[in-house]
């Protein structure tokens, strides 16, 4: 098991450069400080780590266990992905069996780590609540959730809740630069900015994009957008500006080119349009941005409901061309 994990770590940079101790964690300073206090006291309550993907929740749990128990911490921790093993049978069998066995004298307690706990069924959560009460003497539970509101209140009330925020821009870019140096990858500053924008504070996604782009050679903005399957923002802005200038046919041709060259769906296009509307590179009054954002939302809803991509996006460009006439003096 450990050998296969090591192979994966060598292949995936997100695993290879995953922090192993609390001191190595990027950002989340306040949370790390509180977790270090638990290590110092060798005691802690049940924990609920909540926040968006890629913000370090699972990593923090592993680092906490490592700092508590040492290099062999995995023998004192049961890790389950609750989205795969979410039913009451798993809770009653695996978790109960692990929790009921006593720990060695030098180990204060064992840890049950439930990743994606917000995907557990209601019955499984009720069973978990009872186990948390029964085995507090030997076991601590760490629950990880993207949506903590899906965790039943009786469990939330038994946990210390830690809310992980998206990582700060400077921390993401600094980490990416460091990884690029370790892997001897050449990367443009503009590409770092693009990776950060695309990852939206998700460090795991940022590292995966970096690794994928690095496979093509020097990491540039173009290679970044190529590996994520999105159009370069510059080209999206060109399409918008053509439509607003009243060049409907040219805008339509640009749209067709983008969809063919990048394999974009209608939803992909409208999401990128929505992002670029608020770019400082597009000079239109805020009142028009509001109208376009509202229209983009309407078009996306129709696309998700199954409407034809080409017809809806052409209608969107036509509306932009109509709005553009009002912009002209």
UniProtKB/Swiss-Prot annotation:
Domain of life the protein comes from: Archaea
Alphabetical GO biological process terms: DNA repair; DNA-templated DNA replication
Disulfide bonds: none
GO molecular function, one term: DNA clamp loader activity
Matching InterPro entries: AAA+_ATPase, ATPase_AAA_core, CbxX/CfxQ, DNA_pol3_clamp-load_cplx_C, DNA_Rep/Repair_Clamp_Loader, P-loop_NTPase, Rep_factor-C_ssu_arc, Rep_factorC_C
Binding site for ATP: 51-58
Cross-referenced SUPFAM superfamilies: P-loop containing nucleoside triphosphate hydrolases, post-AAA+ oligomerization domain-like
Keywords: ATP-binding, DNA replication, Nucleotide-binding
Pfam families: AAA, RCF1-5-like_lid, Rep_fac_C
Presence of the UniProt keyword Cytoplasm in the record: no
GO cellular component: DNA replication factor C complex
Record's function text: Part of the RFC clamp loader complex which loads the PCNA sliding clamp onto DNA.
Similarity comment text for this entry: Belongs to the activator 1 small subunits family. RfcS subfamily.
UniProt subunit comment: Heteromultimer composed of small subunits (RfcS) and large subunits (RfcL).
Protein name: Replication factor C small subunit
Encoding gene per record: rfcS
């Amino acid at each position: 098991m450990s050998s296969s994990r090591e192979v994966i770590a060598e292949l995936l940079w997100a695993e290879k450069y995953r922090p192993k101790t609390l001191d190595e964690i990027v950002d989340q300073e306040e949370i790390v400080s509180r977790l270090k206090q638990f290590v110092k006291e060798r005691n802690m309550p049940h924990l609920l780590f909540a926040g968006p993907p890629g913000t370090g929740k699972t990593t923090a749990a592993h680092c906490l266990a490592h700092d508590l128990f040492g290099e062999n911490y995995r023998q004192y921790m049961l890790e389950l992905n609750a989205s795969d093993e979410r039913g009451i049978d798993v809770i009653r069998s695996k978790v109960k069996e692990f929790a009921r066995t006593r720990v060695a004298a030098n180990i204060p307690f064992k840890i049950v780590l439930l990743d994606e706990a917000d995907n557990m069924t209601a019955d499984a959560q009720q069973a978990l609540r009872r186990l948390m009460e029964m085995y507090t003497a030997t076991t601590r539970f760490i629950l990880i959730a993207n949506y903590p509101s899906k965790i039943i209140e009786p469990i939330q009330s038994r946990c210390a809740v830690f809310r992980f925020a998206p990582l700060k821009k400077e921390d993401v870019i600094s980490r990416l630069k460091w990884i690029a140096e370790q892997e001897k990858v050449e990367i443009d500053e503009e590409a770092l900015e693009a990776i950060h924008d695309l990852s939206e504070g998700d460090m795991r996604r940022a590292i995966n994009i970096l690794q994928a782009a690095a496979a093509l050679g020097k990491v540039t903005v173009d290679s970044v957008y190529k590996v994520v399957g999105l159009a370069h923002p510059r080209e999206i802005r060109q399409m918008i500006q053509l439509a607003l200038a009243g060049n409907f046919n040219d805008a339509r041709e640009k749209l067709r080119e983008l969809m063919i060259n990048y394999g974009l769906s209608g939803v992909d296009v409208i999401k990128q349009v929505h992002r670029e509307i608020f770019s400082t590179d597009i000079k239109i009054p805020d009142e028009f941005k509001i109208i376009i954002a509202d229209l983009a939302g309407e078009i996306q809803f129709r696309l998700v409901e199954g409407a034809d991509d080409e017809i809806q996006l052409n209608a969107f460009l036509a509306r932009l061309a109509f709005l553009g006439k009002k912009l002209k003096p």
